[in-house]
């Protein structure tokens, strides 16, 4: 099993994470809290009360875990295609796989990624939702002192299953949308690349960016449910399950609640995934 795809996925994912985490923090706040009037209001309040560092809450743990999560995504995707088509990454330009194979490989990568991602994503969301202002004399300390303390607190207060809160919604989110992600990327690359050649840097950037947007527009409704399920149980249980969360959210906030965060998701998705795919492609070409 080639390991280059796993290593390239790790490095490219880390670059994309650093670029996109501030957008992700705003998105999570908009989905789980009703105190903000919109994206700009959320950004202003985060900066005013928590300083610039507020946008990077919860990032240290994803940086540490991205080695596992993105390696699984890109590694499983590429190696599933290897099994389905008997072609390596470089050979696929001359012998492009079918879109069905691409979709199946993407869904496989998304499904396995979700199980690796679930505990890390839960901790990230909990830390991002800490709205305490920057440290001042006499101010109360935040509930969680950091990712390790957060993980230990969840385990102690909610049990081992608590670390996988929202995992079912995460799996339903990632399995089909990662298939969409790779189909969009490959389709755009093929459209604007001469047959048998590698796509140009500009093509990779544009294809990666639009692949990110397409997948996140499809993912946003379940992403909202996932975020709310992850915050459920922090103080008291509100939802009986994913279906109850969906029904309660519609009843209280209307159908529009499912697309809360879609604008910030799209704004984040283009640059993050453009950089992710560009670094991924160039690392694999460099390794030959």
Curated annotation (Swiss-Prot):
Domain of life: Eukaryota
PROSITE patterns cross-referenced by the UniProt entry: SOLCAR (PS50920)
UniProt source species: Homo sapiens
GO molecular function annotation: transmembrane transporter activity
UniProt protein name: Solute carrier family 25 member 45
Topology of the protein relative to the lipid bilayer: Multi-pass membrane protein
Protein family (similarity comment): Belongs to the mitochondrial carrier (TC 2.A.29) family.
UniProt keyword annotations, A-Z: Membrane, Mitochondrion, Mitochondrion inner membrane, Repeat, Transmembrane, Transmembrane helix, Transport
InterPro entries with a match to the protein in the record: Mit_carrier, Mitochondrial_Carrier, Mitochondrial_sb/sol_carrier, Mt_carrier_dom_sf
Primary location recorded for the protein, binned into one broad class: mitochondrion
Repeat region (Solcar), residues: 1-83, 97-191, 199-286
Ligase is among the record's keywords: no
Subcellular location: Mitochondrion inner membrane
